[in-house]
């Protein structure tokens, strides 16, 4: 009896020493993104803020494990993991999301917005919920929101580009997406689909003359080492979607779900500000790393828009669905000021 009593006392002491969160059912949220694990990188800074908020708000019942720099896998592996539930959450660019959800391709239609603020008004409007609901239905993945992947600009190693005619004869790397292939072709250049991981080598070895990306990605991958010229045309406002497996999301408690949603909003605010600050200071930032920067006037941008937007929009209506294009353009019109 004495030993039994002592055993109960010892067990009670052990249990009291264990934090309450370890006694509760602890969940793990694996969170993947594709930028280096550095605090000066928007996606990683956002991920750190998300982790801190979620773990604190849930009292540790929901733990966040960050997989930066593509550690979980490439675009296809990441999106398939989200679909199957082997990955809970990711911050993925629109080209990656298109692997499982083709309608996101409508966001690649060029020259849609007047400003960063206009784009955010669209992506924070009721249109987002309609889009997310459709994505859940078709893929089992929920879209929590969008942040910037940077306004996309053309770079090359051959010459300054100020007009569409200057694009002729250039071989331009694009994401493996028909939207971007159509865009580049419409301007008289030759598109070449190359995945992100292979892009620096392709530029270094002159497999292509140029590429198109946002300032954040140009800096993150040091693409300026191989590209002398950049034209700030801003042809596409590229996005990163904050996406989560729907089964996992529905399996969270109300407190955990609120923490994830609030954490996402905090992460997106950091992500948006860091990326837009780089975009707005692109001429100075890229000039300092040795690029020759061409800034276009509104009239010069209009010349690019006139050639590029109609064929890409027509392609999207035919291949993705007119209803998706119309819905987006309705939201764009409703949020103009």
Annotate each PLM feature.
Residues 1, 24-25:
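Absolute protein N-terminus
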Residues 25-119, 127, 134-337:
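N-terminal secretory/targeting leader peptides
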Residues 1-10:
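Bacterial N-terminal signal peptides that target proteins for export
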């Amino acid at each position: 009896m004495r030993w039994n009593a002592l055993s109960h006392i010892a067990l009670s002491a052990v249990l009291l020493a264990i934090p309450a969160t370890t006694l509760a059912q602890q969940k793990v949220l694996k969170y993947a993104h594709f930028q280096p694990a550095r605090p000066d990188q928007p996606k990683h800074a956002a991920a750190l803020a998300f982790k801190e908020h979620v773990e604190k708000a849930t009292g540790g019942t929901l733990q966040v494990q960050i997989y930066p720099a593509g550690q979980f896998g490439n675009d296809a592996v990441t999106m398939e993991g989200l679909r199957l539930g082997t990955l809970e959450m990711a911050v993925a660019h629109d080209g990656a999301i298109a692997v499982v959800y083709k309608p996101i391709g409508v966001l690649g239609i060029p020259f849609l917005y007047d400003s960063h603020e206009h784009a955010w008004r669209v992506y924070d409007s009721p249109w987002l919920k309609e889009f997310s609901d459709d994505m859940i239905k078709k893929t089992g993945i929920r879209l929590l929101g969008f942040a910037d992947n940077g306004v996309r600009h053309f770079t090359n190693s051959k010459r300054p580009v100020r007009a569409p005619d200057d694009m002729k004869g250039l071989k331009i790397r694009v994401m493996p997406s028909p939207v971007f292939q159509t865009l580049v072709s419409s301007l008289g250049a030759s598109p070449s689909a190359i995945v992100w991981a292979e892009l620096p080598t392709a530029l270094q070895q002159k497999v292509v003359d140029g590429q198109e990306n946002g300032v954040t990605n140009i800096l993150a991958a040091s693409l300026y080492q191989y590209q002398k010229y950049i034209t700030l045309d801003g042809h596409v406002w590229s996005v990163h979607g904050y996406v989560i497996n729907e089964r996992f999301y529905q399996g969270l408690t109300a407190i955990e779900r609120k923490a994830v949603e609030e954490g996402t909003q905090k992460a997106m605010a950091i992500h948006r500000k860091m990326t837009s600050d780089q975009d707005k200071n692109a001429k100075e930032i890229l000039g300092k790393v040795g690029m020759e920067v061409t800034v276009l006037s509104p009239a010069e941008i209009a010349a690019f828009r006139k050639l590029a937007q109609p064929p890409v929009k027509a392609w999207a209506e035919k291949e993705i669905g007119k209803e998706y294009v119309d819905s987006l353009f309705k939201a764009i019109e409703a949020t103009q000021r």
